[in-house]
């Protein structure tokens, strides 16, 4: 029903915009003979002059705030030679949203996945972050995450001036992805041309309140920007700082799983166990940005870009988990009620809940530096040399401690398909006289601790030469090369926790008690809470855990990629129709290697260092054509061959091997350092109608991507002689050829979709509506790719078939207000699962509504503005579910994060 309403809304919007277009459409006149006789170089100079004059006129009428951001983004879209989407700052240090990920997620065909209530990863046209790349000022960036996909909450929106998402390739664009390329851009001080100082402060509050003792539900955000020019505008400086101190409060329920049982003669899905947790998080991020530009002459300009971000998260989770399935726990079932194929409610007798007090800490550091040099050798020749480095480090500690009662308990359970289930226990789990530190689940440990570490470093150098032409068809040619070297490593140490007194149950010291966690959302009054870190330091000892699963998390991947390219820039006439764009080709060669461990026969103590790799190359042609049918109407076409490099955890050299005694042959499984990239051929077509002199637009686009290969696990023939087999003496197979299961380049498939977008300032239609406006988008994407291999049914990770966004705003006389909604249908997403590994989950579709209202003062208070924001207005839940062929969908996880209120002020002078 939600999707039907969205589709109806978009249909009505389309009809309205068609009428708007017809009101303002003008008959296109043929280009005059003077324009047709111009060379491409002269037409380009004329276009730049007209763009500069347009920008000058905008400054004269002082377009500010919401409309300034919209019009700047439209201008970027209109002038680009690729099919792009853009977000532009409304003012210095002020993008439309508090998070850059949320701003990007409002663009047509893009969607964000929430992690702990925050938008972090972005899907472009139905493809997850693994298929895109992220640039900062045109330079490839590394990630503090598990793979290549950038976590966008590392980049404060206050330090960025714009974001451009390239949906079609350009031969000289660095490290492009199959789904798209996201370029985060900081301000250019010499282009701004004036001194600006901006100060911003906001108070933040979470509506959920304090879930865990010791955690505030309030926080703040502050930022400062300074931009200036010196030495007769030959030196420009931009400095920025942004701090985020933000609370996170989560009410969370997870299911262990379901078993199909016959209950009262009916087949029913039986909830096997549950986790009821309250999670509180402290998020502290400091971001720094510096830009120094130097343009001492008409023949040289240089720019030094520096970016640093440190993000510290401390998260405490408290609550309980309880096994419910009688065959596993020895419990007994009473009063069962089955509805819709699900055991809706029941009483479970003789259960033993495990009380959890966990603490997770994560520290991410990102540093990027780049030095760009541009040279003008003559009226026709220019050059560029750019050197950069990007580095990320991530350190985590994941600590679990367990407690429980000495005896067993009873519980009444009621399951809710679209909300929190409720649990009514017999015991009081806040009572320190009842609860002890112990192993109530019989897991053989009293706790557990993990220390994952990631390091990712990329260095690159880029050289480009450009030649302008006095041609009626081609404006010039660009050619050059980019060299990059990247190393990403992961390591982890893990240990069991044992209570110091020989693992005997221990009472919780009174000086460690801090109250109880609020778990009332699931019917549980509370769960005992204590200082997790201090308990770990004083009450437990560690017992190192070494096994094959842990060694599989210890790897390093090295890759050197060299890209050479040539691009012919098109600027001519097709009859009376101006045509611009480019025709390019690039050759990408990659040399990759991975180091890890090979584990024989599951014996981790006998692990062997193992190294493997490969090299390959791809020729990637690309074409972008822009047909200017009239001054308002543009048709764009793009075609290209594309690649996205494989996931780094799939490239790991780690593996295990042994003897299959049944088949009497070698067998094993692991990563694949010889993986080649995902490869695709793509086609794009877009129609754009720019309204009211570029203040609004309507666009419709269609795309087709033919993935020639996809990476999924396959069992292949493998020569095991690459390993040391001397440790095997019994039942040794006669041949070293056996069967090995690993990620492999296999069958691909197609992805198709269409997108519709619009932006209409109503004041251009009727003066009485001055200040009102609306913008939005709708996309429909379908895929025939089977990510688990032929014959499987799981959809492509990151793909929501339907994605829509709409924003309505009013801005006039200093007053502004805006309400936005972004929605996506159900999809497969990635989360951090058991063992700190990545897991895929079915995630329910969601609608997120944000609201803001503000006022910008004038007169003697000119430069001061105030703002009130409410994010996640409806407290939209995050839901996961189980989906299997032949079974009903079963609720897997239900989380609520609360609303976020922000009240603040900005002063610019």
Task: Say what each PLM segment does.
Residues 60-95, 121, 129-132, 139:
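N-terminal periplasmic "start-of-domain" segments of outer-membrane beta-barrel proteins
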Residues 76, 101-140, 167:
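Extracytoplasmic beta-strand/coil segments of soluble accessory domains associated
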Residues 139-167, 217, 224:
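Short acidic/polar hinge/loop motifs at secondary-structure boundaries
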Residues 173, 189-196, 231-235, 299, ...:
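Short loop/turn motifs that connect adjacent beta-strands in outer-membrane beta-barrel proteins
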Residues 214-328, 336-338, 361-372, 621-623:
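Transmembrane beta-barrel wall of Gram-negative outer-membrane proteins
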Residues 351, 355-366, 553-557, 643-707, ...:
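Outer-membrane beta-barrel signature, preferentially recognizing the C-terminal barrel domain
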Residues 501, 706, 823-830, 855-909:
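C-terminal beta-signal and adjacent terminal beta-strands/loops
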Residues 704-706, 723-832, 904-906:
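Gram-negative outer-membrane beta-barrel transporters
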């Amino acid at each position: 029903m939600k999707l039907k309403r969205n589709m109806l809304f978009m249909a009505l919007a389309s009809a309205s915009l068609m009428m708007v277009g017809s009101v303002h459409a003008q008959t296109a006149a043929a280009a005059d003979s003077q324009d047709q006789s111009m060379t491409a170089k002269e037409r380009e100079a004329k276009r730049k002059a007209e763009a500069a004059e347009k920008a000058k006129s905008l400054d004269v009428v002082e377009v500010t705030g919401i409309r300034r951001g919209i019009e700047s983004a439209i201008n970027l879209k209109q002038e680009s030679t690729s099919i792009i989407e853009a977000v532009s700052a409304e003012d210095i240090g002020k993008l439309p949203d508090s998070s850059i990920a949320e701003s990007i997620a409002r663009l047509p065909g893009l969607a964000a996945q929430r992690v702990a209530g925050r938008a972090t990863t972005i899907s472009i046209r139905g493809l997850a972050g693994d298929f895109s790349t992220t640039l900062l000022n045109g330079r490839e960036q590394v990630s503090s995450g598990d793979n290549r996909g950038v976590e966008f909450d590392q980049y404060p929106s206050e330090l960025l001036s714009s974001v451009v998402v390239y949906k079609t390739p350009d031969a000289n664009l660095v490290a492009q992805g199959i789904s798209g390329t996201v370029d985060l851009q900081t301000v250019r001080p010499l282009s701004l041309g004036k001194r600006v100082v901006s100060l911003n402060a906001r108070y933040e509050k979470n509506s959920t309140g304090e879930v865990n003792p010791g955690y505030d539900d309030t926080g703040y955000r502050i930022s400062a920007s300074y931009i200036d020019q010196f030495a007769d505008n030959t030196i420009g400086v931009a400095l920025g700082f942004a701090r985020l101190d933000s609370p996170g409060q989560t009410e969370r329920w997870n299911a262990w799983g379901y078993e199909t049982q016959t209950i009262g003669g009916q087949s029913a899905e039986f909830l096997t166990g549950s986790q009821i947790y309250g999670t509180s998080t402290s998020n502290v991020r400091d971001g720094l940005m510096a830009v120094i530009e130097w343009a001492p002459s008409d023949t040289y300009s240089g720019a030094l870009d520096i970016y640093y971000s440190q993000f510290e998260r401390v998260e405490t989770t408290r609550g309980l988990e309880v096994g419910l399935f009688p065959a596993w726990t020895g419990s007994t079932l009473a009063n069962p009620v089955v509805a819709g194929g699900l055991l809706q409610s029941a009483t479970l007798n003789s259960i033993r809940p495990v009380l959890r007090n966990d603490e997770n800490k994560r520290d991410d550091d990102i540093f990027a530096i780049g030095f760009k040099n541009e040279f003008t050798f003559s009226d026709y020749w220019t050059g560029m040399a750019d050197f950069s480095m990007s580095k990320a480090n991530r350190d985590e500690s994941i600590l679990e401690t367990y407690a429980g009662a000495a005896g067993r308990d009873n519980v009444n359970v009621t399951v809710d398909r679209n909300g929190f289930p409720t649990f009514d226990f017999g015991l009081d789990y806040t009572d320190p006289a009842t609860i002890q530190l112990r192993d109530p689940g019989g897991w053989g440990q009293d706790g557990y601790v993990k220390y994952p570490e990631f390091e990712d470093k990329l260095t690159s150098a880029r050289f480009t030469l450009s030649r302008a032409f006095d041609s009626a068809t081609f404006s010039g040619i660009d050619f050059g090369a980019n060299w990059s070297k990247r190393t990403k490593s992961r390591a982890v140490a893990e240990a069991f926790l044992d209570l110091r007194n020989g693992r005997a149950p221990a009472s919780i010291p009174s000086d460690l008690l801090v109250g109880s966690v609020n778990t009332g959302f699931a019917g549980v009054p509370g769960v005992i809470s204590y200082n997790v870190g201090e308990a770990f330091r004083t009450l437990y000892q560690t017992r190192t855990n070494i096994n094959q699963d842990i060694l599989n998390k210890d790897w390093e991947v090295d890759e050197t990629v060299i890209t050479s390219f040539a691009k012919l820039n098109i600027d001519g006439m097709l009859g009376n129709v101006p045509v611009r764009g480019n025709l390019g080709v690039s050759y990408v060669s990659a040399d990759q290697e991975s180091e890890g461990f090979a584990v024989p026969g599951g014996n981790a103590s006998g692990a062997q260092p193992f190294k493997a790799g490969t090299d390959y190359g791809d020729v990637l042609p690309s074409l972008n054509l822009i047909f200017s049918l009239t001054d308002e109407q543009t048709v764009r076409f793009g075609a290209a061959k594309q690649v996205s490099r494989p996931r780094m955890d799939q490239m790991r050299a780690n593996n295990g091997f042994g003897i299959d005694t049944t088949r009497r042959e070698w067998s094993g499984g692991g990563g694949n350092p010889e993986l080649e990239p995902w490869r695709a051929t793509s086609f794009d077509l877009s129609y754009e109608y720019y309204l009211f002199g570029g203040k609004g637009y309507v666009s419709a686009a269609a795309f087709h991507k033919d993935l020639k290969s996809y990476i999924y696990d396959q069992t292949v023939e493998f020569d095991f002689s690459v390993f040391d087999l001397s440790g095997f003496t019994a039942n040794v197979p006669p041949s070293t050829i056996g069967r090995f299961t690993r990620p492999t380049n296999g069958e691909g498939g197609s992805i198709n979709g269409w997108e519709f977008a619009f932006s209409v300032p109503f004041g251009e239609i009727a003066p009485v509506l001055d200040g009102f406006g609306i913008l939005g988008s709708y996309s429909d994407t379908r895929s025939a790719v089977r990510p688990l291999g032929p014959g499987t049914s799981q959809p492509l990770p990151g793909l929501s078939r339907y994605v829509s966004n709409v924003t309505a705003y009013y801005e006039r006389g200093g007053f502004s207000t805006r309400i936005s909604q972004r929605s996506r249908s159900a999809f497969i997403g990635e989360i951090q699962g058991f063992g700190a590994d990545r897991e895929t989950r079915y995630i329910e579709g969601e609608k997120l509504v944000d609201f803001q209202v503000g006022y910008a003062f004038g007169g003697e208070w000119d430069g001061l503005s105030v703002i009130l924001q409410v994010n996640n207005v409806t407290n939209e839940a995050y839901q996961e579910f189980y989906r299997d062929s032949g079974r009903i969908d079963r609720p897997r996880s239900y989380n609520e994060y609360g609303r976020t209120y922000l009240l603040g002020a900005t002063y610019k002078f």
